[in-house]
A protein has these predicted regions:
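Compositionally biased terminal segments of proteins
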Residues: 1-243, 263-267
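Extended acidic low-complexity intrinsically disordered regions
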Residues: 239-253
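Intrinsically disordered, low-complexity terminal tails
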Residues: 255-261
Length: 267
């Protein structure tokens, strides 16, 4: 993580840059070399939903001729975009699955040669849960997706999420225990929009604490320990984690239920 200001991709400029990449790719590869990009993560969220304003890079599965790399770099140079602005680095992370393309949906075709696809809703949720980073937007994205589908009248059921996790990763137990507990609790609670605001705020707080930690202890944080460190930093804040709040609320409801049964008049 870095405290330096990062480039922000929005729904509007993502479309512009992808269109320019397609045009450049067609110039270099010709008309007979079709390509496909499956947008993952924040880019997929931006394109399909309105609750998130930006992402700092564009992750994608890239199926194309070698000219695609040059096209991406050319567009990046032209618009002053950061190195790796469009990349497939996520294929080296735990959230990657070889089956992602199978569960993608059509978005657009540019220059009659580059097809853009995104990840279907419940599979995007599965990816976010698999990653489960407390210092990024993973868990708030899950809640945002659930909230928007509820508003659209196309709510996502727990069974759909379980199936998506199994389809991509082979089993429910493939998720981190914190992600399992998180999704089970929020699905039972159902206040997706309210929980989204709380979770997004908590993620920003933990992210800021992690930046401070890295400045104080350089070269300590790695890809393997970052989630553990972020979790410990979250516990040290005054704000209780959203998961802790959900568990507390669930306990209160369970404690009230027996009392209500005892107080109920006999018939």
């Amino acid at each position: 993580m870095s405290s330096e200001k990062q480039f922000e991709f929005t729904k509007e400029n993502i479309d512009l840059y992808l269109k320019e990449v397609a045009k450049e790719y067609r110039k270099q590869a010709g008309k007979k070399m079709p390509a496909e990009l499956v947008l993952i993560g924040g880019a997929s969220v931006l394109i399909n939903y309105g609750f998130r304003n930006m992402t700092t890079d564009i992750d994608a599965l890239i199926q194309a001729a070698s000219a695609m790399k040059e096209a991406i770099n050319h567009v990046g140079d032209r618009y002053g975009l950061p190195n790796g602005w469009l990349n497939a680095d996520f294929t080296n992370t735990d959230s990657y699955s070889v089956k992602l393309s199978q569960f993608s949906v059509y978005y657009k075709t540019y220059a009659n040669i580059v097809t853009i696809r995104t990840v279907a809703a419940e599979y995007l949720i599965a990816m976010k849960l698999r990653s489960g980073r407390q210092y990024k937007s993973d868990l708030s994205d899950v809640l945002g997706i659930l909230a928007e589908h509820e508003k659209r009248g196309t709510p996502i059921a727990m069974e759909q999420i379980r199936k998506a996790v199994i389809d991509l990763y082979g089993g429910w137990e493939s998720l981190p225990e914190t992600s399992q507990a998180f999704i089970e609790n929020v699905m039972e609670d159902g206040r997706f929009e309210e929980l989204y605001e709380q979770t997004a705020s908590g993620e920003k707080e933990v992210g800021a604490l992690l930046v401070q930690f890295e400045e104080k202890y350089p070269n300590v944080v790695t890809g393997k320990n970052v989630n553990e460190i972020a979790g410990n930093l979250q516990k040290k804040t005054d704000r209780a984690s959203i998961l802790a709040k959900l568990r507390e609320r669930k306990t209160e409801v369970e404690q009230k239920a027996p009392k209500q049964e005892r107080d109920a008049p006999e018939r």
